[in-house]
Amino acid sequence: MICVSLFLGSLRDNGNSPLTFHKNADMNNQKKLEKSYKPLEVEEAISNLWKETGSFDAIAGSSSDTAFSIVIPPPNVTAALHLGHALNNTLQDVLIRFHRMAGFPTLWMPGTDHAGIATQTVVEKRLINDGTSRLEIGRNAFVQRTQEWKDEYEKIIIDQLIAMGASCDFDRT
């Protein structure tokens, strides 16, 4: 029997994935395609399947295995991701999925904001727009505002990566 599996992050499926189709399968038992594509339903179901099956969790290989990993060059936590981030992350995702399909132990580790300078600048500009400055509000209040900004946009960025279908090991964020 010829089997074609939709690649969902791991080829270690053994044909048991609900998205595996067999040439000799009974087509009467197959779900009919909808007339229109409903991305929110489809993408949520697939994203949940990936999470439930641990499709993107890094699995340590033996000491003789050659591992492949990428740490996302962290986007600054200055705002939501833009098209340039999507392109960059897509290229990384292609490399990770290729190596995963080739049987390499893989890890694509997400992260955000490597230095904080850009985030500090954005928060300072916001304070200026509000008619104050970091010096006027004091160090503790400024650190608190910067932390709140970081927490808000870090969540947005991680949620965007998940929505894009990035095959990161999100348990490592």
What are these regions (language model features)?
Residues 6-8, 22:
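Compositionally biased, low-structure terminal segments
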Residues 8-11, 17:
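Short hydrophobic targeting helices and cationic amphipathic motifs
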Residues 21, 26-173:
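N-terminal, positively charged nucleic-acid-binding surface of large information/translation enzymes
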